Amino acid sequence: MDLLKRSGFDFEKHKTKGIPHQLFAEYLTTSGMCINPNIHWITFHGGVDFGYMLKTLLAHELPNEESGFFDDMNIYFCNYYDIKEIKRDIDYLTGGLSKIAKELDVERIGTMH
C-alpha cells in the first residue's frame, strides 16, 4: 500500500471515481485486448499484475498449479513478455527497468516504483 501511495496512487479518488472490478473485467474482455493474438503485452516483473487481472477476468480464485495459471495466461493474454525474465538470458541487459529502457533506447513511461 505504501509503495502505491508513494507512486502517486490516490486510493480515495479510486474509491469515489473508480469502477467495480466486474465492470473492469467486462470492459477489458470486450475491448479486444484479451484473447487477441495481435496484441502483445510487455511488462517488467508483471506476474502479480497478470495474476490480479486474471482473477478479475475469471471471477474466481487463480489455479493452484503454475501450469494452470499459464494455461489461462495463454488464453487471455496470448502474447506476453516479461523483460525481467528475458534479461536473464541476455548478458548485457542488467539492472532495473530504467537502466534497461535506457540501454534499449526506449522511453520509460510512468513513475519509478
Where do the protein language model's features map onto the residues?
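Metal-dependent phosphoesterase core characteristic of DEDDh/y 3'-5' exonuclease domains
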Residues: 1-113
